Amino acid sequence: MRKLVNLSSNFTKKTRLKGNIKFVIIHYTGMQSEIESINRLKNPRSKVSCHYLINRKGKIIQMVKDNKVAWHAGRSKWKKYTNLNDRSIGIELVNKGHKFGYQKFSIKQINSLIILCKSLKKKYSIKQENFLGHSDIAPLRKIDPGEKFPWKKLSSYKFGHWFKSNFEVDRKRLQNTRRVFFKNLYKLGYRYFNVYKKNSNDKKVIKSFQRRYSPYNVTGKIDKKTLKISHFLAIN
């Protein structure tokens, strides 16, 4: 795997053990250019960084060594874990994001991401379900990598799970829609909601799930399709 090196000083100085790396978190840069993104990831005042950046041409740039904690996840939760920075590798894909003109990720970019993920998965024994998006672990704050990110394609390489297009679910299991849906999400690893009581976080969490698994249907509402997908993923 070919990669360039352009190191940032934005990382926690203490070296972490290889066994502590359990997740890969995928982001988009959300800035107007590659140069602007790199400058921000290297600026000490920004207090943000990533381990790898992949540009539109598919070049992989290492910005923080794997054994250091980069500052990419921020306030985050997934299953029993909080502050996913400590346990993850952060990958930024150059993309203008929703603020500046959200783009389809380039073929070269995704091909390089797959190569990088294969290497990381093998090196750190990362489980298939532990390839996540920033919005999965921080749904109240973040929406990246967004609905144009090809999670279905990545799942075919065993990076993240997907659902079968023709699956059936027992109707009885779909009664009490909201509670069933959030129980399913809790089992998957999502947090920031109350299974038994509606709150103001619900819509953002639903949208986060839809951006990943139902990208043409990001409504923030629990419709039949969204509910069925959540159930399939929770039981498989």
Annotate the PLM regions.
Residues 1-5, 228, 232-236:
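N-terminal secretory targeting signals
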